[in-house]
Amino acid sequence: MDYWDDWYASKAATPTVGEIMNRHLGLPPGLLAGVVPAEAIPELTTGLRLEPGDTLLDLACGRAGYGLTVAQGSGAGLVGIDVSAEALAQAREQAVRLGVTDARFHVGDLTASGLPDGSADAVLCTDAIQFPDDPSAAYREIRRVLKPGGRVALTSWEPVDRDDERLSVRLRRVDLAAGLAEAGFMRIEVRERPAWLERERAIWEEAVTIDPGDDPALISFHGEGVRSLEHLALIRRVLAVATAP
């Protein structure tokens, strides 16, 4: 996946972006993560109900900052799956830095992880469920790899109005409760987290003040800030947890 490999490589070459994001999100300096804030990590960990020795699948893990943190805090082993080999290379380096020894990373995607049926005790997927062309296939894949009674925790954005054409089609179709229910999950909870969105707002407000020059990562960060500020009022920030049958 050349686009994602290039994207992650540019972020690694320009640590300024991560420094700004982590400062607003309350994440530790140097943690390679996304836009889920620090206060979400205990909630994700609790929702996944991991025990020492369990297997946590971090699906579409990117550089696996969240999966590694949850695994480290719970004593679980981690399997990270992503389409980007570059992201996984950075994830492996991060696992070493964090001292997480039971962590494996493989190329795969949300709809075809390559893992055996029932091989995970829990699945974490942060801010990626919107990417597949067939979202229902992603929910089915999560159910397939989970053991009976296994837990899933998802974070994403949902539209305030699904008919609002100012939002991308990918975002307009995100419906965590419906997707999980269609795949057969039970005890589904979707929780709105507006405070997370305000942290994102602070990131993007700083991003648009930056002169990116010719730095690819800063150009991307600045542009994402402009687009995101236009749409923040149109979306809600959500976390979902559910149990496999």
Task: Name the predicted role of every residue range.
Residues 122-134:
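A short SAM/SAH-binding and catalytic strip from SAM-dependent methyltransferases
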Residues 136-148:
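A short glycine-rich, Lys/Arg-flanked "PGG" loop and its adjoining helix->strand segment in the class I
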Residues 57-59, 63-112:
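Class I SAM-dependent methyltransferase SAM/SAH-binding core
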Residues 189-245:
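Conserved Class I S-adenosyl-L-methionine
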Residues 1-24:
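N-terminal, positively charged/glycine-rich alpha-helical extensions of SAM-dependent methyltransferases
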